[in-house]
Amino acid sequence: MDKITVIHTDGNKEDFKPRLISQTIITETGTDKELAERIQDRIAKKLYKLKQNDGLTEISTSDIRAEVSSQLLKEGHFKAVEQNRKLGMSVSEFEDLLQNGCKDNANIGYTPEMIAKYAYDGVAKEYALMDMPKHCSEAHKEGLLHWHDMEYFHLRPNCMNYDLRFFAKNGLKIDGHGLMGSVAKPAKSLEVLLNHLLQAFMAGATVFSGGQGYANFNSLLSVFARGRTYEEIKQAIQGFIFNCNMSLICRGGQCLFSSIGIDMSMPDILKNEPAIGPGGIVSGVYGDYQKEADLIFRAVLEVSNEKDGIGAYHRFPNILINIREGDLDEYSGNCKLVHEIGANNPTLYYVNCAESEKTVMGCFSPDTSLWVKIDNQLRYLSFKEIDELLNADIGKTKVNNIEVLTVDDDKNIIWHKAKNFIKNKPQELYKIKLAGNKSFICDKNHSMITHRAMNKKNILSCKSNLLDVACILNDEQSHLIPDKRAMLYGFYLGDGKKGDDFNKGHANFMLLKEDKIDYARKLLDDLNIKYKEKIVYHSRDDVNYTVFYFSSDEIQKPDLTDINCLAGLLSGLLSSDGYIRINGGFNKSLAAEFVSTDMEYTRLFKWACFNLGIKFSSRIIQPSKNQKNRQPFERIYLSCNYESVRILQQLTLRDKQYQIVQSVDNNYRHITETKSQSVKEIIPLNETDYTYCFEVNDRIIVGDDFILTGNCRTALPMNWTGSYDVDCLNTGNFAYTTLNLPLIALDSNGDVNKFYQKLDEVCEIAYDGLIYRRNCVIDTIYNKHMSDFLLQEDKDSGKPLYDIDNTTITLGFCGLHECLESLNNISDNEGEKILKFLNSKKEEFHERDNLRWSVIGSAAESTAHRFALIIKDKYPDAIVQGVKGNYYLTNSNHIPVSDDSNIVAHIKNAQQYNKLTLGGSILHLWLGEIWSDDKAIWSLNKKIVDSDVTFWAYSKVFTYCQECQFTINDNIDVCPICGSTDLVTYDRCTGYYLPTLGFNNGKQQEFKDRYRHKL
C-alpha cells in the first residue's frame, strides 16, 4: 500500500504508522487498549480509503488529532477528548515538558520560565508555519531549510552590536520613551555607565531573538576610567560581568546571551574621534585614552580568569579579543597578558581585525577586484567590469563619479576621488605570492607597499628580502639556587613530627609514599645530617611507615629575606603538602597548589610566592557537614603563567614525575620579534589583453576590506556604506535561514547540475520567507510600536538606536562536508563553487531589493541534529555524522570534528572558505591539553592573523567538582582532589560554554566525537 506522510507541528515529517495512534491515545487519555486500537483501525481505514479514492498523500498531526477526538466523542469518552485537545501542544506533551524540560537550546535551564517559553513556543511556531507563504512552510517541513527562532518570526530581529557611545551621550530610556520606566540621564561615572549598559542588555533581551554585544568596549569606556585606580576599575568591571551572568531574564530564563569586544590597541578609526565622557560631554579624542583602555582591557581578562565564587568560568559575556596590525609583534603588555590568560582560559575568542596586506602600487590584471564607490553606491568590481562600465579607451579616461579606497603614509584608510582610469596596452605581469597565502598581480615596473611599514620595494628585487625587519630582544633572568636547609625546613613543616619530642631535641619524618621517602633521604644525605631509618608497622592503618630519626637542631628557620632561602622553603612546602600535576597537568590557575590546615604554614608559603614573583590565589575550605572532626583548610592555587613556571621549574621537587613540564625556554629569555612578511614566489604570467589602474593621490587598496565580528558568528564587514559607524555599530543580523546542503544534494541524486538548479530554488524560497519575516517585524517595530526601546533617538542627529535598513539578511548553510560526499564527479574546489553560488544569489537579491544580504556559516545547534535525522529517515544510506538516534551534520563548512588532521589543516580549511562567508564564521580549534603553552598560542595566533581567518577560539573541555569546587581543563569522572563523582563537564556548544548534560542528542554525540589537538 502506498505511503501517507504525516506532518508534525514543528514541520518534521514521517511515514503514517497506525500503531502510533493507539499508543498516543493510551498515553494521553489513559483509555484501555481495546478502545484505542478500535479507534486506530477506524482512522487508518478512513485515511487509506481517502488515499485510494481522492489521492491523499499528506495529513497533519492536527487533522489526525481532530479525527481521534471525533471518534472518542462517538464512544462517549468526553474526558478523554479534553485530554486529547491541542493548545500548541497536547496535555501529555505539556506534562512531559513539566516533568523533563527540553534540550532544544542548551542555554536554557529547567525553570518555570522555560516551561512558559516552550508552552508559548508551541503556539507561536505552529502559527508561523501556518501564516508564512506555503512553499516556505513546506520547505521547512521537508528539511530543505530551517527557519530559526520561529517563535519570534513575526516579532523580533535576531541580534545587535551596540555602540555604547549612544548611551554614554544620551542616557537610557528603557522602554524607548519613558512612560513605562525611569529615564536615566547620561552617566557621570564608570559604575553608572556600566549599569546602563547592563540595563540596555536586559531591555534588548525583550526585543531581540539572539545575542547582543558592545563593540570596542574598553576603548569607548576609557574616558570614564580617567582618574580612577586600577582596583576601582577592576571592581566596576567585575560587577558588570557578574551581573551579566546573574541576569536570568532572557527568553525563558536564559542568561543574557552577550558579548564584548575588547581592543588590544586603540583602533585607528577611533583615535581622532570625539571622546564621549561623563555626563555625555566630549573630552578630547579617544587616542588620548590608550592608558585607560589598557587598564580596562586588563581588568576584563583578569576578572574572566579569576572565575566566579565557586571557581567556575563566567559563561557570558563572550570576550572577543580584537587583534589589529602590530598587536602581536612584541610579547609584552596586552599581547603577553592575552596569551598568558588565553593559553588556559578556554572561554576567549579572537577576532582578526588586521587590515589586508594587499595594498600595492602598480598596474593590475583585468580580474583584480577592488572596492569602489560609483555615484555613491558601494561596489566590489574587477578592473574588467569597471572598464566595461566606462567603455574606456586605451590610456587615461577622466572620471568624476568614482571613489576608491586608499591608504596614506600614516596608514589611514580613506576614500579618494579618482582622477583618471588607466587602461594600458598588454605588458608582462607577475603574480607575487607572500606568506600566509597572500598574493597579488601587478606589472614589473611598479613598487609594492605594505600597510605595516610603508616601505617601497621593486617587484623583481623582493624575492629574497623581508618586507619588515625582524628584531630579537633578549631579557636575561637570574638563576635561582634553592637553599637545601630551607628545603628541609619546609618539608618538615608539612611532613615532620612536632610536639614534645621535638622540643626535647628529637625530630622525625614518618612517611608512606616512596617519592617522599626518597626525597627525605636525599635531603638528609645532601646536608650530611646523621639519621636513623626504620620501618615501623602501624596497626590502625595496617601499613608500614618509613621513619627517619635525627636531631631537631637540624631544623632551622631560614632567612625569609633571602631569595634562595625562599626558593628552598617553597620547594620543601610544595614537596610535602603541595600537589603538582604530571607534565604540567592542571589549567592555569590550578597547575600547582598547596593545602594546609595550619595558617602559619600557608602564610609562609604565600610570603615565598610573593617574593619570588609567583602569582597565586587562595580560599578557605570549610569541612562538609559529614566531616565533623575535620578542620578548615586553606588551598593556595599557583598561577602557572610563563613567569611562574620559569621560577617553579628551578625548584628541587620530590621525584621528577611531580615536576612541572619543561615547556619554556631553558635559557630564561623573552624572545620578541616583529611580524615579518616575506615574498615566497614571483611567477611570470601570460600576457593579458590590458592592464589597469586608477590615478589617485594615495595608494589604492585592492582585495578585501576591514572586518569587525559581532555576536555569535555574525560578522559586519565595512562594505555597506563604507562608514564604520553605520556598517558595524548599532546594527546586526536581522534574520537568517539555514540551508540543508546534503539533502539538496541527495534530492538531486548526486548530479552536480541538478544540485545547483535545486539550490537555486531553495535560495529563492529562503528569499521569500526572509522578506516576509522582515515585513512582519517592520510592522511590529514601526507600526505597532511593540519594540520602542529600539526607536529612542540620538539627541543631536535624531537617528534611532536601531535602523533595520542597515541590518544584514542572511543565507546560512549546514553540512558542506556531507554535501560534497553526496555529489558525484565534483571538482577539487567544488566547495568553493557552492559558496560562490550562494554569494552570487546574495548579490542577485541585493540588486533585486537593495537590502544588505550576506552569507554565513550557520551556528547550527539543534538544526544540525534535525537535518541529519530528516536525511537518514529519507535516505537511510546517506552519509552523516554520529550514530543511530544521535545523528548530526558537520557545522557549516567545517571539517568533521572527529578528523585527526593537524591544526594547520583546520586553519587552511577555514581560510579557504572565510572570504565566502563574510556574514560570519568561526574556526573552533579543539584542544586536549590541560595546560597550553602561552608562547605556542602566540605563535599560532600570529599565523592565523596572517591568514584570511577572522574569528576563532581555542576550545577545551573542563570539569567542575561540585563537592570541593575544583576546576580542571579535562574530561574526568572522579575529582583528583576529593574523590567525588559529583562533577559537571562543560564544553563549547556553539557560541558559549555550557554543561554537556544540556546538549541535545546530536550535540552530545558531537561532544564525544571531538578530536582534541595538542599544540
Residues covered by each model-derived region:
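Protein maturation boundaries and topogenic segments
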Residues: 364-386
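Conserved catalytic cores of very large enzyme subunits
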Residues: 98-363, 712-805, 832-985
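Secondary-structure capping and boundary motifs in well-ordered enzyme cores
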Residues: 13, 60, 485, 561-571, ...
